[in-house]
Amino acid sequence: MSQRKPWEILIRPIITEKSNRLMEDYNKYTFEVALDASKPEIKEAVEKLFNVKVKKVNTMIVKPKKKRVWERFRQYGTTKKWKKAIVTLEKGINRHPWVCSEVRCRDGC
């Protein structure tokens, strides 16, 4: 489907308290993805990279936030906008080793 490599589509996993809760309770994994990536491309990239079956992909664009820069005078800038994807895996697939490589899990996997 896509000519891009999977690691060009998936930029990095998002590791926060909320994403960890989604991971443990609902089998959902959160990634920062390329801004122009589509849902089918994201699904294909996750399936190829991690050898799992993806049930569903939800995407959202995170708006830029204002930041203050204290140089000579008070100046304002913004962070860049980015795209977030929440990937739901099939029911039988739970807690893969690729998650533990990013964050040490309690179960010692």
Curated annotation (Swiss-Prot):
Organism encoding this protein: Aquifex pyrophilus
Family per similarity comment: Belongs to the universal ribosomal protein uL23 family.
The encoding gene: rplW
GO molecular function: rRNA binding; structural constituent of ribosome
Protein name per the record: Large ribosomal subunit protein uL23
InterPro entries per UniProt: Nucleotide-bd_a/b_plait_sf, Ribosomal_uL23-like, Ribosomal_uL23/eL15/eS24_sf
KW 4Fe-4S (keyword) present: no
GO BP, sorted A to Z: translation
GO cellular component: ribonucleoprotein complex; ribosome
Signal peptide as annotated in the record: none
Summary of subunit composition and partner proteins: Part of the 50S ribosomal subunit. Contacts protein L29, and trigger factor when it is bound to the ribosome.
Role this protein plays: One of the early assembly proteins it binds 23S rRNA. One of the proteins that surrounds the polypeptide exit tunnel on the outside of the ribosome. Forms the main docking site for trigger factor binding to the ribosome.
